[in-house]
Amino acid sequence: MKDILRGSADEVKIVRASLEHLVDAETLLGEYYELVGVVQRDTPAGVQKLLAEEAGGFWIAYVGRMPAACVMLRPLPAIPGAAECKRLYVRPEFRGEGLAKSLMDILEAFAARLGLDWVYLDSKDDLEVAIELYRRRGYEPCERYNDNPQATIFLRKATQP
């Protein structure tokens, strides 16, 4: 990470969120939904369940005490050995600092530790920066795997080399 890690007073800390982080998780998700125009939104009960999920998780990057970015991993029961990356979001004032890369590193390592074979994700054509990040990380096109009406791109990555 660039400036926010080099000599800055604002320490970056990434945590696997729990129920004590619920307000920050809902705040980041709300901003993401509005920015991207998400139609299928996670319910409050769904977010709470994910925060307690052992086979998935929700990570928040904090800069100082400010929640700056998030990502979630949730099981894909219809695809054995797979989970789905969702809601990668970095607040505008923290973009370009490597937070998305750090969150994806943690998510992918967690998926590998769970013994999963694949991480899937969907996106929209207009999220070009995110799509480029995914492709640089080795995500490759795959068949549609869900019924998300807004998704136009479907990618997956093997978790084991």
Regions from the language model: what does each represent?
Residues 2-86, 91-92, 104-106, 110, ...:
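Acetyl-CoA-dependent GNAT
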Residues 91-93, 97, 125:
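Active-site acidic-Proline motif in GNAT/NAT acetyltransferases
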Residues 153-159:
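Short, basic/aromatic-enriched C-terminal tail that caps enzymatic domains
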Residues 101, 113, 125-143, 148-151:
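Conserved active-site alpha-helix within GNAT-family acetyltransferase domains
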Residues 22, 97, 128:
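Loop/helix-junction capping segments adjacent to catalytic residues or to phosphate/diphosphate-binding pockets
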Residues 97, 101, 105:
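Residues forming the Rossmann-fold NAD(P)(H) cofactor-binding site
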Residues 104, 111-123:
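Conserved GNAT acetyl-CoA-binding A-motif
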